[in-house]
Amino acid sequence: MRTIKKNNEYKIQRYISRGAGRWVHLYDYGSGISPTLECLNELKSIGYKIVATTPHEKYIKLSELPLDCPMALVFGTEMDGISSEVIDNADYFVKIPMYGFTESYNISVAVALTLQSIRNRLENENISFDLSKEEQIKLKIKWATKIIRDGDKIEQEIRRRLMEKTK
């Protein structure tokens, strides 16, 4: 998960969702001239399409969003929506259907609705979205080093010993 800190600090609450925040890898962008552009450019450089949620721009329905490549979903704030930097750099704009008088969902609701819609499509269209075995192993190693005391040192020692064995 990538967070862009402009006006507010983002901090995972330790006790929410029974500690699920420990298993989310956070990339923080909050310093520099343009943290938003830094984040978007980094994502694009590793093959991600930028998908911005908005009720105003030209948009496609979530059901029409191409699912053939990695995507980064961008959600704006309830007050201001997405920034002009996101508008200028997004590959797609999607609109979350809303009914009634307001044009805004709480951010957690917007994320949940969007992810559920995409997940349903992936399953219904039999699109594989699982991590590869190699990606799973790398992630498990990363998690293990987080929960074991001196996990980084232990990982380095294991890697050193494995390298010695292969010589």
Regions found by a protein language model. Give the residues of each.
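Short beta->alpha connector loops at strand-helix junctions that form conserved
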Residues: R2, G30, T77, V94-F101
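Structured adenosyl-cofactor binding patch, chiefly the S-adenosyl-L-methionine
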Residues: I87-S132
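Conserved catalytic motifs of the protein kinase core domain
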Residues: P70
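SF2 helicase motor core recognition
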Residues: G81-I87
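RNA substrate-binding interface of SAM-dependent RNA methyltransferases
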Residues: M1-K58, L115-K167
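Structural alpha-helical scaffold elements that stabilize or flank donor/cofactor-binding regions
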Residues: P66-L67, V86
